[in-house]
């Protein structure tokens, strides 16, 4: 999962149709975990305001397990900030199209007709054990380790038969050269941004990176020492060898559990937690008004839309009219207003106009996208009956004569999604689908559904990038395709859809630097999207960042916006972890 494509810490939904093949729908929201209280910083860490731990709580964590493997701990939101706090990338490409920020790679240059990328590395980086970070580590990481390790560690697709990467080599101790087979104008923002660098001298000895828990991590990030670990909270203290002079500006990070949106709210209201990415209903009344000078909320719309996603390889989700009818049957405005308290605007069936209006220029695309997203149960029923669906009384039957059923599963503490899935269930009942809400106790009871072949649908939100390319690439490209039953975190292809036409259009987009030709490819992809509707966008994906400046300033905010504002989004969180400063300095 990754702004990276598919980074959890975002809502999910799984849907199931009952017939020859039953379907399940799992809807997830922005928080979960057993209740916890704030722990105290280790005695070795000063408890002054300048050095107290920045305390965070997030969404979806059961009892913590000591797993700091950045390749496998990504299923839990707490595991997401392992990348950013411990492990770092080469170039930070912030969400929302902001300017790329040099990181471990301080400069880069394209040559050979834009097919060769040379990365010049920082020369003063050390791993937390004091060993220098060099091109050997970068080449090892980008290639996906050695041999069999690539099954777990190949984030760039270097070992895939269809890879566009011709070679990755070191050019001395502090430069790396990546040669591509064809031009890829999106390589840095959609491929290289997935990469984080691990120490070759540690990981080359790991026999099975899929099961390795990395209990004592060696990393290059700003917070690498596990100062305390319990099943309810843990503390990362700063890296004594960190390469950015004077950073991090704070002494430690602490992550604690919260069982629900309400319990997380209680923790931040009391001052026990400084930062959370949990939904807060009526946030002005419930939180910011309690201490206007210090309590803040920044709900940035820097992510792709929340969408209803189906396993398009399974019946009846392989039927385009069925997918379109579901889009027509869902009342997006009510979900936005009642389920999300107006913080998440409803989208069209295209889903990208809010984030990328400059890329949606065709009038026919706009009209069709609006029509498919207009709440109209009567039109939805006609779409279904025209496609061979029938009714037995008020019950919808698929073309094979089987009843259609969608059970919506949601973690009980995620109050916004409990409300939203109730609206969805009611909408589906109105067109004859047997739909009900099923409450799940925690993340561990829900998460296995995402990759199960028995549960072919989910609600998914991937991180925003500088253009719609990443959105279309995840959902239309043969190169991003992930077979049913496998984890699609790295590519975001949870609906298991692929398109030869979409792949060709994406290639056209990648292989040109001409903005007009890129726009032409984008418009063609938009038209293809509305023809096929592989997933159903519902509303803009908000990034719930609720934070207190009683002890810390310099958070990502409307006045200080530099990327995705939540702490689970890599690589943007690298910016937050190195910029957040003690109270008394400028900024919110």
Which role fits each region the language model picked out?
Residues 55-112, 143, 216-219:
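N-terminal lobe/hinge region of extracytoplasmic solute-binding protein
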Residues 211-214, 240-286, 422-425, 434-443:
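Ligand-site clamp/hinge motif
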């Amino acid at each position: 999962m990754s702004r990276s494509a598919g980074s959890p810490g975002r809502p999910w939904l799984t849907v199931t149709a009952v017939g020859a093949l039953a379907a399940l729908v799992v809807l997830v929201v922005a928080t979960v975990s057993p209740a916890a209280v704030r722990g105290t910083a280790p005695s070795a860490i000063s408890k002054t305001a300048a050095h107290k731990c920045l305390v965070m709580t997030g969404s979806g964590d059961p009892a913590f397990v000591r797993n700091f493997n950045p390749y496998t701990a990504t299923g839990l939101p707490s595991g997401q900030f392992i990348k950013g706090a411990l492990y770092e990338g080469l170039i930070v490409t912030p969400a929302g199209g902001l300017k790329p920020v040099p990181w471990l790679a301080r400069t880069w240059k394209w040559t050979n007709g834009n097919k060769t990328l040379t990365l010049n590395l920082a020369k003063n980086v050390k791993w937390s054990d004091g060993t220098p970070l060099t091109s050997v580590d970068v080449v090892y990481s980008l290639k996906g380790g050695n041999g069999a390790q690539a099954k777990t560690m190949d984030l760039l697709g270097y070992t895939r038969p269809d890879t566009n990467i011709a070679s990755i080599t070191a050019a001395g101790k502090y430069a790396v050269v990546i040669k591509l087979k064809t031009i890829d104008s999106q390589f840095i923002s959609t491929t290289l941004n997935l990469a984080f660098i691990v120490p070759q001298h540690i990981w080359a000895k790991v026999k099975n990176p899929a099961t390795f828990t990395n209990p004592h991590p060696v990393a290059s990030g700003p917070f690498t020492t596990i100062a305390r670990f319990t099943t309810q909270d843990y503390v990362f203290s700063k890296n004594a060898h960190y390469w950015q002079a004077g950073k991090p500006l704070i002494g430690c990070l602490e992550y604690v559990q919260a069982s629900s949106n309400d319990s997380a709210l209680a923790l931040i209201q009391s001052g026990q937690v400084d930062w959370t990415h949990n939904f807060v209903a009526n946030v002005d009344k419930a939180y910011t008004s309690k201490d206007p000078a210090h309590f803040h909320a920044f709900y940035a719309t820097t992510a792709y839309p929340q969408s209803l996603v189906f396993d398009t390889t399974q019946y009846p989700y392989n039927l385009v009219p069925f997918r379109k009818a579901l889009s027509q049957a869902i009342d997006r405005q009510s979900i936005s207003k009642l389920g999300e308290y107006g913080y998440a605007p409803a989208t069209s069936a295209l889903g990208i106009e809010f984030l990328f209006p400059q890329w949606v220029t065709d009038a026919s695309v706009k009209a069709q996208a609006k029509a498919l997203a207009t709440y109209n149960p009567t039109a939805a029923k006609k779409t279904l009956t025209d496609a061979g669906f029938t009714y037995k009384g008020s019950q919808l039957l698929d073309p094979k004569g089987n009843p259609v059923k969608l059970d919506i599963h949601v973690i009980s503490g995620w109050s916004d999604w409990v409300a939203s899935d109730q609206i969805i269930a009611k909408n589906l009942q109105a067109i004859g689908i047997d739909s009900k809400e099923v409450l799940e106790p925690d993340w561990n009871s829900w998460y296995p559904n995402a990759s199960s072949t028995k549960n072919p649908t989910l609600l998914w939100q991937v991180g925003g990038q500088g253009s719609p390319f990443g959105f279309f690439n995840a959902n239309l490209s043969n190169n991003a395709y992930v077979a049913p039953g496998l984890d699609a975190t790295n590519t975001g292809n949870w609906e298991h859809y692929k398109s030869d036409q979409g792949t060709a259009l994406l290639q056209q987009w990648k292989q040109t630097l001409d903005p007009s030709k890129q726009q032409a490819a984008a418009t063609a992809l938009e038209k293809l999207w509305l023809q096929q509707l592989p997933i159903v966008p519902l509303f803009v994906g908000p990034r719930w960042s609720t934070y207190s400046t009683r002890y810390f300033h310099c958070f990502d905010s409307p006045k200080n916006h530099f990327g995705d504002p939540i702490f689970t989004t890599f690589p943007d969180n690298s910016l937050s972890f190195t910029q957040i400063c003690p109270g008394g300095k400028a900024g919110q």
